A protein has these predicted regions:
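FMN-binding flavodoxin-like domain, especially the glycine-rich phosphate-binding loop
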Residues: 1-46, 56, 68-72, 91-94, ...
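Cytosolic transmitter module of two-component histidine kinases
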Residues: 51-57
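A short, well-structured beta->alpha microelement
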Residues: 70-88
């Protein structure tokens, strides 16, 4: 058996070159060990990107993250928090929350329902979920990134496990977003087995 990159795989020349070398190493190891088991390269890690936004910044970052994860071979889904019922949350494998904070520490309008449901006594255990939160805010406000901090705290309290630590972003969020999304790619790709 020999692993190879399909001709229609969406990689740049440099990525293709690196992957070919990587797969050549795996192929030579398989041949040397005489291992006849089929090799499986995982593809399509399911990821739900839930966004809460008052002005559109968190939504734009969610769509940007969708593209990045798709290019990396994962299976992302972008969801407005208003369209993500609490009853569906325990079935999510990887949950990425991108949310702003509105006013004086309030969740954005479209995140309010999920926020309140997660903080209710009826909130389900979420031990099967891996998650991370990107919190957008303005350090000029006393309750800087409060909504994102609250989501992070509540998901952890309900048993969800962090993929990467929470990242808080001030008005200039491009660099923190980039670092967070790069860490996520690595963390999700390294997950091989369900919880």
């Amino acid at each position: 058996m020999s692993l190879r990159i399909p001709d229609n795989a969406p990689f740049t020349g440099a990525q293709r070159y690196w992957l070919k070398g990587y797969l050549d190493g795996i192929n030579s190891s398989l041949q040397a060990s005489g291992d006849e088991e089929p090799a499986v390269i995982e593809r399509g890690h399911p990821v739900t990107i839930a966004w809460g936004s008052q002005t559109g910044n968190a939504e734009a970052l969610a769509k940007k993250l969708f593209k990045k994860l798709s290019k990396a071979g994962m299976s992302p889904k972008v969801s407005d928090m208003a369209d993500l019922p609490l009853v569906d949350l325990p079935t999510v494998e990887n949950l990425l929350v991108i949310t702003s904070t509105y006013g004086e520490g309030e969740p954005p309008d479209n995140a309010r329902s999920l926020y309140q449901a997660l903080h209710s006594e009826d909130a389900p255990e979420l031990g099967g979920i891996r998650y991370s939160v990107l919190a957008l805010g303005d350090s000029g406000h006393e309750e800087f990134c409060k909504c994102g901090l609250d989501f992070d705290d509540r998901l952890s309290t309900l048993g969800a496990r962090p993929l990467v630590p929470l990242v808080t972003c001030d008005v200039d969020y491009d660099e923190p977003y980039q670092l967070w999304s790069d860490q996520l790619l690595e963390a999700i790709a390294s997950v091989r087995t369900p919880l």
